């Protein structure tokens, strides 16, 4: 077996179908699915590498239970910042595995389009570029892959853009227009970069596929769960209602809280994340966006 994918959600299933074109693949999932080759975790460890496509909030618990051998190679396909500790996904993983065996998938990609075989370009970030290059060989030709070593930058982009996507959904849901939306997304990119640079990320990462590419995609389409969270909030729905309708995890909710905590602790200016978190805690969306778009913020 070439690749074993951990997690049978939308993203894990899409990656399974894509990788199957060129590689032998199995899926480790709690629920059985017709037409999908599934295996146990023990069997998955025989693969060349694992693709981790579980919710970032479940990552630490899964790693504690899995007890992976140190030689395990992982391509991480989940995005987020741990609430409470403020740890990036890479920081959590490096508590369990050597960093030279870890790589991180980033870039603009909706699961639905990947599942349909539509072309896209992604980035594999890793401290060990040879590992990233090796993993890229198992993807089909219609997924263009680049390799980069800015792990922190790739992670911050992947996590933060979900928060900006919620703001984008709110902006569109309130009918504030294209001018306001462009301002919000552009400022969101600057805010992401400022946060990432504080932790040593490269500015170039935020201008490429992992940053601007993923942000522009996610903040303007109903294919984005986080964007739909924002739309729902603007329409007056409760967060509980929205999550029931989604039926899936929207990582931006917990990430907004984590970023706000880190920004307050470290003195980082993060007004969009702050307002999104306030809205998620019950603040009026219209009032929040008015505050954000007015002079002085």
From Swiss-Prot:
Q: Which domain of life is it from?
A: Bacteria
Q: Which Gene3D superfamilies match?
A: N-(1-d-carboxylethyl)-l-norvaline Dehydrogenase, domain 2 (1.10.1040.10), NAD(P)-binding Rossmann-like Domain (3.40.50.720)
Question: Which pathway does it take part in?
Answer: Membrane lipid metabolism; glycerophospholipid metabolism
Reaction(s) this enzyme catalyzes, per UniProt: sn-glycerol 3-phosphate + NAD(+) = dihydroxyacetone phosphate + NADH + H(+); sn-glycerol 3-phosphate + NADP(+) = dihydroxyacetone phosphate + NADPH + H(+)
Checking SUPFAM superfamilies in the record gives: 6-phosphogluconate dehydrogenase C-terminal domain-like (SSF48179), NAD(P)-binding Rossmann-fold domains (SSF51735)
Q: Where does sn-glycerol 3-phosphate bind?
A: 79, 107, 109, 161, 214, 224-226
Q: What class of enzyme is it?
A: oxidoreductase
> Belongs to which family?
Belongs to the NAD-dependent glycerol-3-phosphate dehydrogenase family.
InterPro entries reported for this sequence:
6-PGluconate_DH-like_C_sf, 6PGD_dom2, G3P_DH_NAD-dep, G3P_DH_NAD-dep_C, G3P_DH_NAD-dep_N, NAD(P)-bd_dom_sf
Protein name (database record) = Glycerol-3-phosphate dehydrogenase [NAD(P)+]
Q: Which PANTHER family match?
A: GLYCEROL-3-PHOSPHATE DEHYDROGENASE, GLYCEROL-3-PHOSPHATE DEHYDROGENASE [NAD(+)] 2, CHLOROPLASTIC
Annotated EC:
1.1.1.94
Starting at the broadest rank, the lineage of the source organism is: Bacteria, Pseudomonadati, Campylobacterota, Epsilonproteobacteria, Campylobacterales
Supply the alphabetized keyword list: Cytoplasm, Lipid biosynthesis, Lipid metabolism, NAD, NADP, Nucleotide-binding, Oxidoreductase, Phospholipid biosynthesis, Phospholipid metabolism
**A Gene Ontology BP annotation from the UniProt entry:** glycerol-3-phosphate catabolic process
């Amino acid at each position: 077996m070439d690749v074993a994918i951990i997690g049978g959600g939308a993203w894990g299933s899409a990656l399974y179908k894509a990788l199957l074109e060129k590689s032998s693949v199995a899926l480790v999932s709690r629920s059985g699915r017709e037409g999908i080759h599934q295996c146990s975790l023990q069997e998955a460890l025989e693969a060349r590498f694992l693709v981790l496509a579980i919710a970032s909030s479940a990552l630490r618990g899964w790693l504690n239970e899995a007890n992976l051998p140190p030689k395990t190679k992982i391509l991480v396909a989940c995005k987020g910042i741990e609430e409470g500790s403020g740890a990036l996904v890479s920081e959590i993983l490096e508590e369990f595995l050597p960093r030279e065996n870890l790589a991180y998938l980033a870039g603009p990609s909706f699961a639905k389009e990947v599942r349909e075989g539509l072309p896209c370009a992604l980035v594999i970030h890793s401290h060990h570029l040879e590992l990233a290059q090796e993993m890229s060989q198992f993807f089909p030709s219609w997924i263009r892959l680049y390799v980069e070593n800015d792990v922190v930058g790739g992670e911050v982009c992947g996590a933060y853009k979900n928060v900006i996507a919620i703001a984008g959904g709110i902006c569109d849901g309130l009918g504030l227009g294209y001018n306001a939306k462009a301002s919000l997304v552009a400022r969101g990119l600057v805010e992401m970069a400022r946060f990432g640079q504080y932790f040593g990320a490269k500015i170039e990462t935020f201008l490429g596929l992992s940053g601007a590419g993923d942000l522009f995609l996610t903040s303007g389409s109903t294919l984005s769960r986080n964007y739909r969270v924002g739309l729902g909030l603007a329409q007056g729905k409760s967060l509980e209602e929205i999550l029931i309708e989604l039926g899936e995890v929207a990582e931006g909710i917990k990430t907004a809280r984590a970023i706000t905590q880190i920004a307050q602790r470290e003195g980082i200016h993060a007004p969009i994340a702050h307002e999104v978190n306030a809205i998620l805690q019950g603040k009026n969306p219209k009032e929040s966006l008015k505050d954000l778009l007015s002079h002085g913020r």
